[in-house]
Amino acid sequence: MLHLVVYDISDDGSRARLAKLLEKFGLQRVQYSAFRGELNPNDREVLARQVGKFVRDDRDCIFIIPLCQRCSSTAIVISNTGVELVKEKGVEFV
């Protein structure tokens, strides 16, 4: 299932290590602190356990959000980067 992972991590080093971990899980960066990609239920559980170590103070937070096919196919992306951020049919680029 497609997932969106967004985070706010205050420590620069921890934030960089978290990004590398998300890339190891095959997720693609779509914003500075946001990644998206396919995770099976087992990988999602493993990822959830591993990212907990990056939450160290009250300001730190990580969301792992599942996106159903219908929701992801109706996404609206507002960007001028020219980077292919999504591949689903029906996604509107503004």
From Swiss-Prot:
Q: Which UniProt keywords apply?
A: Antiviral defense, Endonuclease, Hydrolase, Magnesium, Metal-binding, Nuclease
Entry-linked PANTHER family: CRISPR-ASSOCIATED ENDORIBONUCLEASE CAS2, CRISPR-ASSOCIATED ENDORIBONUCLEASE CAS2 3
Q: Where are the transmembrane segments?
A: none
State the organism named in the record: Archaeoglobus fulgidus (strain ATCC 49558 / DSM 4304 / JCM 9628 / NBRC 100126 / VC-16)
Q: Output the SUPFAM superfamilies linked to this UniProt entry.
A: TTP0101/SSO1404-like
Name of the top EC class for this enzyme: hydrolase
Query: Cross-referenced InterPro entries, in alphabetical order?
Result: CRISPR_associated_Cas2, Virulence_VapD/CRISPR_Cas2
Which Pfam families does the entry link to?
A: CRISPR_Cas2
State the disulfide connectivity: none
User: Assembly state and interactors?
Assistant: Homodimer, forms a heterotetramer with a Cas1 homodimer.
Which positions bind Mg(2+)?
A: D8
Q: Which family does it belong to?
A: Belongs to the CRISPR-associated endoribonuclease Cas2 protein family.
According to UniProt, the name of this protein is CRISPR-associated endoribonuclease Cas2 1
The EC number of this protein is 3.1.-.-
Q: Does the keyword Transit peptide feature in the UniProt annotation?
A: no
What processes does the entry annotate via GO biological process terms? Answer: defense response to virus; maintenance of CRISPR repeat elements
Task of the protein: CRISPR (clustered regularly interspaced short palindromic repeat), is an adaptive immune system that provides protection against mobile genetic elements (viruses, transposable elements and conjugative plasmids). CRISPR clusters contain sequences complementary to antecedent mobile elements and target invading nucleic acids. CRISPR clusters are transcribed and processed into CRISPR RNA (crRNA). Involved in the integration of spacer DNA into the CRISPR cassette. Functions as a ssRNA-specific endoribonuclease.
